[in-house]
Amino acid sequence: MLLSELSHPNQLHGLTVSQLEEIACQIRERHLEVVSTSGGHLGPGLGVVELTLALYQTLDLDFDKVVWDVGHQAYPHKLITGRFNEFDSLRQQKGIAGYLKRSESHFDHFGAGHASTSISAALGMAIARDRKGEDHKCVAVIGDGALTGGMALEAINHAGHLPNTPLVVVLNDNDMSISPPVGALSTYLNRVRLSPPLQFLSDSVQESVKNIPLIGKDIPEELKNIKGSVRRLAVPKVGAVFEELGFTYMGPIDGHDISNLINTFNAAHRLKKPVMVHVVTTKGKGYPYAEADQVGYHAQSSFDLTTGKSIPSSKPKPVSYSKIFGQTLLKICEQDSKVIGITAAMATGTGLDLLQKNIPEQYIDVGIAEQHAVTLAAGMSCDGLKPVVAIYSTFLQRAFDQLIHDVGIQNLPVSFVLDRAGIVGADGPTHQGQYDISYMRAIPNFVLMAPKDEAELQRMLITSINYKGPTALRIPRGSGLGVAVMDEGWEPLKIGEGEILEEGDDVLIIAYGSMVQSATETANLLKNRGISACIINARFVRPLDQDLIIPLVRKLKKVVTMEEGTLVGGFGSAIVEMLNDNDINIPVLRIGIPDVLVDHASPDQSKEKLGLTPDQMAEKIINKFNLAKLNSKITVE
């Protein structure tokens, strides 16, 4: 059978192992073909091809449910659930998503883009199944990295206390970070664990003993204790942990041995209780470059399949904001040993890999544990250290209570750098950094800031580290503007002080962060129409520069706010609240992301759809305030 002929995963039923292995090869070919052209997550999906095929051969996916953690590794799932012909559109506007999405396919049983959610969701489905008297299977597939998340451990703790709730958790261990996957002892123990006579022997003996007159009622409890002791001796160390938490442990299993996987999954399904199947896979399996560099090939932009090298852009781009941040923080750490960089499993993405490489003693990676990262930093700051927590905007949402309870209320000097703030592009709604302005500006004591360019980023970083309270600095994804940066001598900013970038008499534009450049371009378009705009770089949303803004508002009486964040409770709302508190009642046009989910597309495509391009914003301003229009076409000077 050809992969292209698969429209339903149940078509895998009855196929031989050799046929499944052939389909596995086709999945990898298609996976590599598309990701090398359009970009996407590469290594995770390549590592779970056999796991996916074997698991799905043991399930009836018209009824059974599988929850994939994060979704990085779900490309093979998409290819065998009717999306082969659409796979070319992966992560493109109006194409299929890079993650699981319930609205995209009824086989996507639970949407995800953040880690550690799968076991909770699958357990919830299992409980609902049992309440309704149904009998389908519920499976969660989670990676060893995601298992470091507290939510996953909370779910395991809960599931282990529901011994009569059938649930299979597949632990996809692709980093050997939990236990060694090879060795005669592991192979032997796994073979013993999967042996039906041993698996059910103690249960059978226990049932027989119950029927012995007089003594039958007393022995089972002792037998139960003996059975538990034998299990603790027989199971590898990591397995014992799961057994103590109430799971039956199976593994570790070779995640690329389809025959063994099928036997293991069938054995797991027969047990009507929580089961942990530990599967060891190789991230990037089948593509040597991805196997050799599992971090670098976790996700890739377009690349040459033959050489494995990224295809360079036809037009050189400036250095990214993330890299400028990483370079600057490294220089600060070289001068101050109290400054500590903290990340939650995103060293390369946030730019902290430079610190990790050069001054590892001033670098901490807590794993996928955002809540812990925040409170860890809070504790460090109590005793004189200067923690800088670099984290994606979308992931910091997971630690909202810690931001309030452990940092804000105690007014602790912790610096947060929110990477990927604003529109992020092809990763879609689970990864858009559109909410941080709203959810952070309500927290007491926090200072919130965003730079207009790379040089201002450096000044804001040193400002944050020197400030005696909590700060949050948001930076956008991607390249900077090409503004020159400094190697040292960064001048701190005065907290809450904005700046006038351009004088004007007709309308006041107050822009925040990445939208300052867009405001300048918009003002140029308005100038072509005979409209003079005054531009303020707000720099801060908490506190706002009232001394600068209010006099200009009273003078111009027409106000526009611009932000790359949600309008609900965002920067524009902060300006309106400030004006209301000062009894200023004038029209305000708030420009930003409306109350919608921003789907996957390129950032430029998303901005156009949201009305955030300079020409669209110029038209909005003209229409809102009935400003005089000239007949000349709007063009950028």
Curated annotation (Swiss-Prot):
rRNA-binding among keywords: no
Top EC class, one word: transferase
Binding site for thiamine diphosphate: H72, G113, H114, A115, G145, A146, N174, Y287, E370
Cofactor binding note: Binds 1 Mg(2+) ion per subunit.
Catalysed conversion reaction: D-glyceraldehyde 3-phosphate + pyruvate + H(+) = 1-deoxy-D-xylulose 5-phosphate + CO2
Tagged with keyword Transcription: no
Residues annotated for Mg(2+) binding in this entry: D144, N174
Keywords: Isoprene biosynthesis, Magnesium, Metal-binding, Thiamine biosynthesis, Thiamine pyrophosphate, Transferase
Molecular function terms from GO: 1-deoxy-D-xylulose-5-phosphate synthase activity; magnesium ion binding; thiamine pyrophosphate binding
Pathway: Metabolic intermediate biosynthesis; 1-deoxy-D-xylulose 5-phosphate biosynthesis; 1-deoxy-D-xylulose 5-phosphate from D-glyceraldehyde 3-phosphate and pyruvate: step 1/1
GO cellular component, one term: cytosol
Listed GO biological process terms: 1-deoxy-D-xylulose 5-phosphate biosynthetic process; isopentenyl diphosphate biosynthetic process, methylerythritol 4-phosphate pathway; terpenoid biosynthetic process; thiamine biosynthetic process
Cofactors (names): Mg(2+); thiamine diphosphate
Annotated EC: 2.2.1.7
Function: Catalyzes the acyloin condensation reaction between C atoms 2 and 3 of pyruvate and glyceraldehyde 3-phosphate to yield 1-deoxy-D-xylulose-5-phosphate (DXP).
Subunit annotation: Homodimer.
Family indicated by similarity: Belongs to the transketolase family. DXPS subfamily.
NCBIfam families: dxs (TIGR00204), PRK05444.2-2 (NF003933)
Protein name: 1-deoxy-D-xylulose-5-phosphate synthase
Organism: Prochlorococcus marinus subsp. pastoris (strain CCMP1986 / NIES-2087 / MED4)
